[in-house]
Structure formats: structure tokens, C-alpha cells
Amino acid sequence: MGCVQCKCCSRYPSSSSDGDSRGPLEANGVLKGKDQKPLGSIHVPSPNFDMVYSVLSQRGYYPDSPDKENQDTYCIKTELQGNPNVHFFGVFDGHGVLGTQCSNFVKERVVEMLSEDPTLLEDPEKAYKSAFLRVNEELHDSEIDDSMSGTTAITVLVVGDKIYVANVGDSRAVLAVKDRNRILAEDLSYDQTPFRKDECERVKACGARVLSVDQVEGLKDPNIQTWANEESEGGDPPRLWVQNGMYPGTAFTRSVGDFTAESIGVIAEPEVSMVHLSPNHLFFVVASDGIFEFLPSQAVVDMVGRYADPRDGCAAAAAESYKLWLEHENRTDDITIIIVQIKKLSNE
């Protein structure tokens, strides 16, 4: 992403997810330095069901930067606006030199804006979009230099028996759906990257060059698309570049911050979806792309579904992701996962 100059970041805390692992998995497969919170539970009075949740965040393993901090952070806020039926879960994946400061800033301000918005229950989608766009402007105007730093965000707002999902970037939310004797993964968000034809065309219309690193460096023909899809692509995905420079090189098409990338179509407007919960919905997962880089949504749901305790599900998914990272690369990304189980929900 390149170096940037810090204006003044001392007032912004480090990530609440501060695992300090100095190396890969321990011999028994357990993550070192992980930050896992106690089991949490929420009762939703209307329509009378329970949620049980856990979160785990693991700092990435970077051999060349052993002291690199965890740029992921997360937020679990119960009873927004004092309403026992409204709850918020979010994961924020920072990037760039000041990614940690960006992810913490956005985490705090998004939930504050939603909490203060009188239209939240009347029109959650409108409230979501307003919050992210306003936070983006606040970040630009803050003491944090976000010219080449920012954060993605995946958030879930529970409003009674409905969940509203707002996505900015390439983190993901997935719902586990019981279908007879199977548990199926239903994506609640869709990664906003140049792999998506609609997003690729949108940023190109804004002036972005969409090329892999090898293409930008002249190792491959820039006029021939060298990537197929996200699952089959190796370690050289399509990225966004200005017309006459080798920056910013973002692998996503939406984020909060990234002021420089806005000139080539990177936007902070979230895509918002809604699902009406039913007894067939068992749990949902909210996680950074550190989880999903090498694990498809169905594999994550299969793994989490084996465990009665969401703490165990978090640990298993994080450990498997960590292992797969090291099998494919000599490092791992930061990894953050929230699992929320849905219990005692009836059709009545």
C-alpha cells in the first residue's frame, strides 16, 4: 500500500483484539496469543428467542514484521438505543500503516451513530448507509492520515427477528440454515472486489486500472485478463491502480478511509441486505477475510456446526484458517470471527 505520514494517532487506542502471537501454531494446533472473550448471551423479548455468542481475534504471523499489531477489531453492542430487541455485531479489518487507528475509529463511530439515529428502527438500511458515509467523512477530517489507510467493515444489526447486514469491503457474514439433515451456508454479504463484474466495471468507469501485481510490474500482459475467479486465483489477485502510478493497489472496491483510492471509485457506501429469521436458522458468522481467504463459506459453517459451544467453533475455524494460510504462504493475515447462535426461536 505504500508509506503514509501520521498526523497524530496517539489519541486512538490499539485494537481491542490484541493477541501478540510471535509465531505460528503451537504443536497441538492451538493458536498462540489469541484474544477470546467469555461466552455471551442475549435474550430478545420480541419475538422471544435467545442468542449465544463468542468472538476470537488472532494477530497475524508476519516473519518480516514480528511486532506488527493486529489491525482487526470488533464490536458487540447489546440493546442499542436501550432497546432489548436491537443488537449489533461487527468486524473491522484495518489496512495500511494506520489501519489499526482506522478500524478502531470506524468501529466506535459507526455504532455511536446508529445508537443516536432516530430513524434506525423505521429504516435500518437508510440509517446504515448514512452512518458509514458520515463516518468516512469524519475519518478524512480526523487526525488520522487515511490517505493510504482504511478499514473494511462487516456488521450485523439484529432487530427483533430480522437481521440487517451492512458490508463495506471483503469481510463476510454467513448464515447457517438447517435443510433436512444438512446445514447449508447462506452468504449474507458478497465480497466487494474486482472479481465481481459489477464492481470491476464500476471502478473502471471511475478511472481505475484493474491489474494484478505481475501485470503492473510488466511480468504479464496488461491487456489480457489473467485471473478467473476468487477461488481459483493464487496469490496475485486483481487490484486497483491509478492511471499513471503504482498505487494504491487495493484488492477491494469499497472501504472506509482510503482517501487516495476514492479518486478511482473506492467508496464507503455499504451494501445492505435483510433476512427474516426462522427456526431453521441456527447461527451466523461474522468474520474478516483472514477466515475466508482459503475457506469457503460452506466449509466454515460445516466446521462451526460441529460444536455446541461457539467458543470452540471460533477456535476451530481460526486454527484451520491459520494452518491453511501457512500452507499457502509464509505468513498469515489477522483473523477475527464472531459466532452468534440462534436459540428457541419458534414460528409462533
UniProtKB/Swiss-Prot annotation:
Keywords: Hydrolase, Magnesium, Manganese, Metal-binding, Protein phosphatase
Keyword Ubl conjugation (UniProt): no
Low complexity composition bias: residue spans: 11-24
Residues annotated as domain PPM-type phosphatase: 52-342
Highest taxon, organism lineage: Eukaryota
Enzyme Commission number: 3.1.3.16
Listed InterPro entries: PP2C, PP2C_BS, PPM-type-like_dom_sf, PPM-type_phosphatase-like_dom
Family classification: Belongs to the PP2C family.
Protein name, UniProt field: Probable protein phosphatase 2C 35
